[in-house]
Amino acid sequence: MGNKAERHRAIQEIVRREEIGTQKELVERLRQLGFEVTQATVSRDIAELGLARIALGKGRHRYVLPAADLPENAYEELKRQFGLFVRDVDRGGNLLVVKTAEGHASGIAYLLDRLRRDEIVGTLAGDDTILVVARTEEAAQALEDEFAGLLVEGRALRRALSGS
């Protein structure tokens, strides 16, 4: 079933709506929809569509759409990820250091980058640490304040999810 354009549309819709972490899962999902695909075909499709694979933690990953295709609620996803997985934020000059739960830094940095905020020059992520380079010290201060607010919201969310 379907040509390349239809398959690409299906992949975008699947990735937008579902948590797909491996090429094998994507192959299986496309086959359920009637597409005759191989892992090699899906691998090429992923590259052509510019999909990124981000860490969700605890060994889990998810394919996400490129920046131009991020849903309008991308900031809501950043808030959710930030609230659940960020542990601390510190600032020095125009630099912020964001400490996360192990394995979550790259996913959060990816979302920050994809929002293309003018006040953020760029990010650099390790396993549990993100370096955020702000354009100015004032921008860094504003980001630190914003992130502190997200931390407060996140602690409330973590408490609600843990039932305590």
Curated annotation (Swiss-Prot):
Molecular function, one GO term: arginine binding
GO biological process, one term: protein complex oligomerization
InterPro entries per UniProt: Arg_repress, Arg_repress_C, Arg_repress_C_sf, Arg_repress_DNA-bd, WH-like_DNA-bd_sf, WH_DNA-bd_sf
SUPFAM superfamilies: C-terminal domain of arginine repressor, Winged helix' DNA-binding domain
Subcellular location: Cytoplasm
Pathway membership, UniProt: Amino-acid biosynthesis; L-arginine biosynthesis [regulation]
Keyword tags: Amino-acid biosynthesis, Arginine biosynthesis, Cytoplasm, DNA-binding, Repressor, Transcription, Transcription regulation
Highest taxon in the source lineage: Bacteria
One GO cellular component term noted in the UniProt record for this chain: cytoplasm
Function: Regulates arginine biosynthesis genes.
Family listed: Belongs to the ArgR family.
The protein's name in its UniProt record: Arginine repressor
Gene for this chain: argR
